[in-house]
Amino acid sequence: MRRSLTALIIAFAATLVCFVPAGDGAAASIPKRRTKVITLQRTVCYGTCPVYELTIYSDGRVEYLGKQFVKKTGRATGRITRKQLEELVMEFTNIYYFNLPASIEPGSKHCPQGATDHPSAITSLTWQGKSHSINHYHGCRGSNTLELLRKLEDKIDAAVNTKQWTK
């Protein structure tokens, strides 16, 4: 319990640091110029899993590319609010995204149990000069890290309203 509380306090403090104005008055959170911040790619499986890519930019613009087993194939665009983008970045921060391994697949420490024929979700975050990407194989089970990533991926989809293009 004490360890969880300590982790929560550290995560909250780290999040506050991300959103404090810089000394020159410029916002230290979301960059003003349009840069790629978050990506989510859902890959093929043995079946009819939706295959698509999302890119979220610092100005809230969303680019979608539908590939297979989706309602909308090809390109589409959308938009999320600055607040939604900040909340998504906070979700990445809360799970210590930059500290997680680049690949979670059968045989790795974070994949104690693995099943075949599942899709992967590949996420990335570019934030405050750092960039990290994680290939999360959805056939992996048995680790809290997996559930945290799955929830993060679902929150990205929800913020963007990906269902408008995939269902």
Short names for language-model regions:
Residues 64-67:
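Beta-turn initiation residues at beta-strand->coil junctions
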Residues 2-6, 22-46, 52, 70-72, ...:
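Short, well-ordered, aromatic-rich surface patches in folded extracellular/luminal domains
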Residues 9-18:
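Bacterial N-terminal signal peptides
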